[in-house]
């Protein structure tokens, strides 16, 4: 099915608009804005980009740790997105200015309760957006107040790169540097490249970083 996740996104948004699903005021406003944008001729929906990101995440990434509500271990199982996460991706990379390939949103603030996969989502966004924008030479930084928090996302991606056999040291396409000086991964592909690096917040040293994707974990805005 070409846009197989679109009905899921619409059902999620409709359930909030109708009141079937309990939601906070800000989420209700986000849903109303979403429906207004769909009817606004100033924007168009790029289903292909949104589906690319969703399917890249669900078909290449697996959980590194965690359990289901019933205690079933998640490690090694596919990283399947919840409807609200698909709604986020359709908004972020699907909605574009009319007659252009420019996304409407260049910044997102995502509030998620504790122990609901914020870091996994941050890493999944870094991975999928980096691949989506590979033709432009994508560069992504994941920053946190402490390097240890940034490494949660990096280690999640590193685990998956190794699991897929894509680490360059094993003959794969992704060069990984993971030592005391640097935590990064990069790949040059036939139609582009991407670079992802984990950083600790350091305003004195990071004022000149040049990237098209920036993710701050625990505060969780995404810029591109």
What do the predicted segments below correspond to?
Residues 1-224:
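Phosphate/NTP-binding elements of NTP-utilizing enzymes
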């Amino acid at each position: 099915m070409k846009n197989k996740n679109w009905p899921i996104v619409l059902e999620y948004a409709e359930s909030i608009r109708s009141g079937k699903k309990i939601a906070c005021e800000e989420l209700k406003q986000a849903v109303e804005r979403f429906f207004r944008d769909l009817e606004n001729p100033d924007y168009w929906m790029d289903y292909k980009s949104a589906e690319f990101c969703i399917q890249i995440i669900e078909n290449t990434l697996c959980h590194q740790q965690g359990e289901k509500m019933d205690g079933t271990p998640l490690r090694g199982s596919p990283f399947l997105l919840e409807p609200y996460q698909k709604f986020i991706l359709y908004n972020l990379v699907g909605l574009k200015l009319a007659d252009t390939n420019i996304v409407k949103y260049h910044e997102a603030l995502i509030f998620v309760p504790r122990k609901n996969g914020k870091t996994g989502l941050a890493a999944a966004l870094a991975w999928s957006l980096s691949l989506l924008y590979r033709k432009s030479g994508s560069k992504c930084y994941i920053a946190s107040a402490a390097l240890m928090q940034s490494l949660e996302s990096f280690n999640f991606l590193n685990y998956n790169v190794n699991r897929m056999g894509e680490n360059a040291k094993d003959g794969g396409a992704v060069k990984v540097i993971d030592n005391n000086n640097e935590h990064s991964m990069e790949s040059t592909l036939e139609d582009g490249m991407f670079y992802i690096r984990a950083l600790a917040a350091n305003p004195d040293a990071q004022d000149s970083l040049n990237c098209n994707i920036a993710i701050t974990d625990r505060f969780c805005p995404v810029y591109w």
